[in-house]
Amino acid sequence: MTMQHVFPTYQRFPFAITDGQGVHLTDNHGKTYLDFTAGIGVCNFGYHQPQIQAAVTQQLTHIWHTSNLYENELQDAVAGLLANGEERLVYFANSGTEANEAALKLARKYTGKTGILAFQHSFHGRTYGAMSMTGNPHIQAGYAPLVPGITFATYNDDAALDKITPELAAVILEVVQGEGGVFAGQTAWLQAVNAKCQATGVLLIIDEVQTGIGRTGYRMAYEGYGLDPDIYTVAKGLANGLPVGAMVGRRQLATAFGPGSHGSTFAGNAVAMAAAKCVLPQLTPALLTTVRAHAKLVWQSLATQVEPIPVVKQITGKGLMIGIHLDEQIPVNQVITRLQVEGLLTLSAGDNTLRLLPPIVMQPADLLAGIALIAKVLTTLTTEVTTNE
């Protein structure tokens, strides 16, 4: 199949996914794969999860969309679940980039300041404001002039603390940089950034689009670092595949976000809200403890089976968000293609990094089977490179 009628903005693999069940996907040729992508960190609860499917199916028999001209009980219920007992309010969007745009607008409007500090190798989205806060020149190429007032610092570098001054409106960061190479923030550094923001009156925005909804073994990744953001954004896993995003901010910020200050026609539609209302209560302490335990097994397996392979430079990440950094002799896309042949779907990130984002409900047998396949393919490719030298 060759796609003839769609802009070629994606470099696609030459097969289509036609079905999914649990943590496995099936393509248009009938081949089944173990999924270490979760739709790029979206389907954290896998495919055809009975509770989510039932919630969505039931909502489809009622209302799908009404716009935001009327009160919406589903939105308020999901917002309450996101607030999780804290004094926070929620703005719903359709995606992560929209949620980050809302955070940018709110930060500037509330503080009356324009300066934003972001970080190199970050990714916050592809719409103009979010792209301008993304520390990747490749993403920004050809789109100048970008949104002004945004500066960048080095991630995990104490020198960044000196750039947090009262003149800023906000600092935006990911606690684990996903697209940039799966680099986890150092706890002491993240806490120092949080403290400096509080001391200077600068808003701290944490982008949880990829790290949230249990990905690191916590409801939101920042909780595992003891952070207290003024605003956080979430999207990918929130509705397990339906388009939704959310900006969650302190209640006092509402003074700058009244009627007409921001909006979206589709945001918070009933079907996506039904899915999110089903997803969030499943993030129980028991499940999150299990995710952390399973992640520990995965990291142990990586340390013994994958890390010793000569082409592996380092392994980074947090929880079930993993980056295997490869020697330039082994292009990551070659690894991904070989793994597809073996029946495992994986992702890339950063310069030459194999990224793993399995569903958080995947059981140890499948997780370890996937790691074994990665070790097999990397060992084979190492042998091939050595033979050809």
Curated annotation (Swiss-Prot):
<dbReference type="InterPro" id="IPR050103">
    <property type="entry name" value="Class-III_PLP-dep_AT"/>
</dbReference>
<feature type="binding site">
    <location>
        <begin position="96"/>
        <end position="97"/>
    </location>
    <ligand>
        <name>pyridoxal 5'-phosphate</name>
    </ligand>
</feature>
<dbReference type="GO" id="GO:0042802">
    <property type="term" value="F:identical protein binding"/>
</dbReference>
<feature type="modified residue" description="N6-(pyridoxal phosphate)lysine">
    <location>
        <position position="236"/>
    </location>
</feature>
<keyword id="KW-0963">Cytoplasm</keyword>
<dbReference type="InterPro" id="IPR015421">
    <property type="entry name" value="PyrdxlP-dep_Trfase_major"/>
</dbReference>
<dbReference type="InterPro" id="IPR005814">
    <property type="entry name" value="Aminotrans_3"/>
</dbReference>
<protein>
    <recommendedName>
        <fullName>Acetylornithine aminotransferase</fullName>
        <ecNumber>2.6.1.11</ecNumber>
    </recommendedName>
</protein>
<dbReference type="InterPro" id="IPR015422">
    <property type="entry name" value="PyrdxlP-dep_Trfase_small"/>
</dbReference>
<feature type="binding site">
    <location>
        <position position="265"/>
    </location>
    <ligand>
        <name>pyridoxal 5'-phosphate</name>
    </ligand>
</feature>
<dbReference type="GO" id="GO:0030170">
    <property type="term" value="F:pyridoxal phosphate binding"/>
</dbReference>
<keyword id="KW-0808">Transferase</keyword>
<dbReference type="GO" id="GO:0006526">
    <property type="term" value="P:L-arginine biosynthetic process"/>
</dbReference>
<dbReference type="InterPro" id="IPR015424">
    <property type="entry name" value="PyrdxlP-dep_Trfase"/>
</dbReference>
<feature type="binding site">
    <location>
        <position position="123"/>
    </location>
    <ligand>
        <name>pyridoxal 5'-phosphate</name>
    </ligand>
</feature>
<comment type="similarity">
    <text>Belongs to the class-III pyridoxal-phosphate-dependent aminotransferase family. ArgD subfamily.</text>
</comment>
<dbReference type="GO" id="GO:0005737">
    <property type="term" value="C:cytoplasm"/>
</dbReference>
<dbReference type="Pfam" id="PF00202">
    <property type="entry name" value="Aminotran_3"/>
</dbReference>
<feature type="binding site">
    <location>
        <begin position="207"/>
        <end position="210"/>
    </location>
    <ligand>
        <name>pyridoxal 5'-phosphate</name>
    </ligand>
</feature>
<dbReference type="InterPro" id="IPR004636">
    <property type="entry name" value="AcOrn/SuccOrn_fam"/>
</dbReference>
<keyword id="KW-0055">Arginine biosynthesis</keyword>
<dbReference type="InterPro" id="IPR049704">
    <property type="entry name" value="Aminotrans_3_PPA_site"/>
</dbReference>
<comment type="pathway">
    <text>Amino-acid biosynthesis; L-arginine biosynthesis; N(2)-acetyl-L-ornithine from L-glutamate: step 4/4.</text>
</comment>
<keyword id="KW-0663">Pyridoxal phosphate</keyword>
<keyword id="KW-0032">Aminotransferase</keyword>
<keyword id="KW-0028">Amino-acid biosynthesis</keyword>
<feature type="binding site">
    <location>
        <position position="126"/>
    </location>
    <ligand>
        <name>N(2)-acetyl-L-ornithine</name>
    </ligand>
</feature>
<dbReference type="GO" id="GO:0003992">
    <property type="term" value="F:N2-acetyl-L-ornithine:2-oxoglutarate 5-aminotransferase activity"/>
</dbReference>
<feature type="binding site">
    <location>
        <position position="264"/>
    </location>
    <ligand>
        <name>N(2)-acetyl-L-ornithine</name>
    </ligand>
</feature>
<comment type="subunit">
    <text>Homodimer.</text>
</comment>
